[in-house]
UniProtKB/Swiss-Prot annotation:
Family stated for the protein in its record: Belongs to the UPF0502 family.
Name recorded for this polypeptide: UPF0502 protein CJA_1529
Signal sequence bounds: none
Lineage: Bacteria, Pseudomonadati, Pseudomonadota, Gammaproteobacteria, Cellvibrionales
SUPFAM superfamilies named in the record: Winged helix' DNA-binding domain (SSF46785)
Length: 218
């Protein structure tokens, strides 16, 4: 399959696939995810822009549609079905590209410094220069999955975003920036990352307990 996807991803599809990709890289022992774990991952209060409030039924319907598109695969366990994303295999993305795509799907357009901070638990780029070189390569493909957004009014840096949900409305992005002050990466972002780390550790422990219960039931 080539980019762009046909049809493009809806907001909930992007959130579901992004959450699956994130947990696959950050908490592999808790992956694939059950419906409940996936719902919690989609509706996290941290590392999500915007924060969502999806219901279980909405996520289940989305999963069913993604299964039909071969973008999600179900793993039938002893106690509950678990869901595995297939997007990165369908479109042949390596781990570095998966980490970048994951953050953009969950948090929208990102600066290089934001990507460096927010991908560090998924892939060790080491520097913003390494990320920039990777994105430059990805942005010049015949059917690119990523796009470079020059610095807009009210912004200090260029940004990058994914194109799996379509091309951006640059006027809307500029308006969002005008109505919301820039985040301080050395403060709030680092706090969010620490909270997310604790959430992921809790999810991993819960998954380990669930797997032990599955084994005891066999």
């Amino acid at each position: 399959m080539e980019f762009p996807l046909d049809p493009l991803l809806t907001p909930i599809e992007a959130r579901v696939l992004g959450a699956l990709m994130e947990k696959q890289l950050t908490t592999p022992d808790a992956y694939p995810l059950t419906l409940n774990s996936l719902l919690l991952a989609c509706n996290q209060k941290t590392s999500r822009e915007p924060v969502s409030h999806y219901e279980s039924g909405e996520v289940q319907r989305c999963i069913n549609e993604l299964q039909e598109r071969k973008l999600v695969e179900v793993d039938w366990g002893a106690r509950a079905a678990r869901y595995d994303q297939r997007l990165t295999r369908v479109v042949s993305l390596d781990k570095a590209a998966q980490a970048l795509l994951c953050v953009m799907m969950l948090r929208g357009p990102q600066t290089l410094s934001e990507l460096l901070t927010r991908t560090q638990r998924m892939f060790d780029f080491g520097s913003t220069q390494a990320i920039e070189e990777k994105l430059q390569h990805l942005c010049v493909k015949t059917h690119p999955a990523f796009m470079h957004i020059p610095r807009l009014a009210g912004q200090r840096e260029d940004r990058y975003m994914h194109l799996l949900s379509g091309a951006p409305d640059l006027e809307a992005l500029a308006a969002q920036t005008h109505n919301r002050s820039e985040r301080n990466d050395d403060g709030r972002t680092q706090l969010e990352e620490r909270v997310t780390l604790l959430e992921n550790q809790l999810a991993e422990l819960q998954a380990q307990v669930a797997r032990l219960l599955e084994k005891s039931a066999e």
